[in-house]
Protein backbone atom coordinates (compact mmCIF):
# COMPACT_ATOMS: atom_id res chain seq x y z
CA UNK A 1 0.00 0.00 0.00
CA UNK A 2 1.33 3.42 -0.88
CA UNK A 3 0.63 5.98 1.81
CA UNK A 4 0.11 9.66 1.14
CA UNK A 5 0.49 12.84 3.12
CA UNK A 6 -3.07 12.65 4.46
CA UNK A 7 -2.05 9.62 6.54
CA UNK A 8 0.78 11.63 8.02
CA UNK A 9 -1.66 14.41 8.82
CA UNK A 10 -3.89 11.87 10.57
CA UNK A 11 -1.02 10.59 12.68
CA UNK A 12 0.11 14.09 13.52
CA UNK A 13 -3.41 15.16 14.47
CA UNK A 14 -3.49 12.16 16.80
CA UNK A 15 -0.39 13.72 18.38
CA UNK A 16 1.76 10.64 18.09
CA UNK A 17 5.47 10.97 18.76
CA UNK A 18 5.45 14.74 19.14
CA UNK A 19 8.53 16.82 19.84
CA UNK A 20 10.36 19.90 18.62
CA UNK A 21 12.38 18.32 15.82
CA UNK A 22 11.79 18.77 12.11
CA UNK A 23 11.42 15.59 10.08
CA UNK A 24 11.74 14.75 6.42
CA UNK A 25 9.59 12.09 4.83
CA UNK A 26 10.40 10.26 1.63
CA UNK A 27 8.67 7.55 -0.37
CA UNK A 28 11.03 4.55 -0.35
CA UNK A 29 9.86 1.25 -1.84
CA UNK A 30 6.20 2.26 -1.53
CA UNK A 31 6.57 3.24 2.12
CA UNK A 32 6.78 6.73 3.52
CA UNK A 33 9.85 6.83 5.71
CA UNK A 34 10.63 9.61 8.17
CA UNK A 35 14.09 10.93 8.97
CA UNK A 36 15.19 13.42 11.55
CA UNK A 37 16.40 16.63 9.97
CA UNK A 38 20.11 15.84 10.26
CA UNK A 39 22.42 18.05 8.13
CA UNK A 40 24.06 14.97 6.60
CA UNK A 41 20.84 14.11 4.79
CA UNK A 42 20.88 17.47 3.04
CA UNK A 43 24.47 16.87 1.98
CA UNK A 44 23.92 13.40 0.49
CA UNK A 45 23.70 13.88 -3.25
CA UNK A 46 21.64 10.71 -3.76
CA UNK A 47 18.68 12.42 -2.05
CA UNK A 48 16.77 14.64 -4.47
CA UNK A 49 15.22 17.36 -2.32
CA UNK A 50 12.08 17.37 -4.47
CA UNK A 51 11.34 13.79 -3.34
CA UNK A 52 11.07 14.82 0.32
CA UNK A 53 8.17 16.25 2.27
CA UNK A 54 9.18 18.78 4.92
CA UNK A 55 6.89 18.35 7.91
CA UNK A 56 7.91 21.70 9.37
CA UNK A 57 4.69 23.17 7.97
CA UNK A 58 2.63 21.09 10.39
CA UNK A 59 1.96 22.11 14.00
CA UNK A 60 3.14 18.80 15.44
CA UNK A 61 6.11 16.78 14.24
CA UNK A 62 6.90 13.09 14.54
CA UNK A 63 9.30 12.19 17.31
CA UNK A 64 11.63 9.34 16.38
CA UNK A 65 14.15 10.18 19.08
CA UNK A 66 17.36 8.19 18.80
CA UNK A 67 16.80 6.90 15.29
CA UNK A 68 18.99 7.81 12.34
CA UNK A 69 17.66 5.10 10.04
CA UNK A 70 14.33 5.49 8.21
CA UNK A 71 11.18 4.53 10.09
CA UNK A 72 8.33 3.16 8.00
CA UNK A 73 5.12 5.03 8.76
CA UNK A 74 3.08 1.83 8.34
CA UNK A 75 5.00 0.30 11.28
CA UNK A 76 4.21 3.32 13.43
CA UNK A 77 0.53 3.02 12.52
CA UNK A 78 0.54 -0.71 13.30
CA UNK A 79 2.07 -0.03 16.71
CA UNK A 80 -0.51 2.67 17.35
CA UNK A 81 -3.38 0.35 16.46
CA UNK A 82 -2.00 -2.32 18.81
CA UNK A 83 -1.82 0.23 21.61
CA UNK A 84 -5.42 1.23 20.98
CA UNK A 85 -6.58 -2.39 21.28
CA UNK A 86 -4.99 -2.82 24.70
Q: What is each residue range found by the language model?
A:
Residues 11-13, 36, 70:
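Alpha-helical interaction segments
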Residues 31-45:
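Short, surface-exposed terminal/edge motifs of secreted or surface/virion proteins that either
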Residues 25-26, 36:
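Hydrophobic side chains in beta-strands
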Residues 49-86:
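Low-complexity intrinsically disordered segments
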Residues 19-23, 29-31:
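Short, surface-exposed beta-edge/turn micro-motifs
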Residues 6-18:
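Surface-exposed ligand/attachment interfaces on beta-rich extracellular proteins
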Residues 10-12, 46, 52:
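Tryptophan-centered short beta-strand motifs
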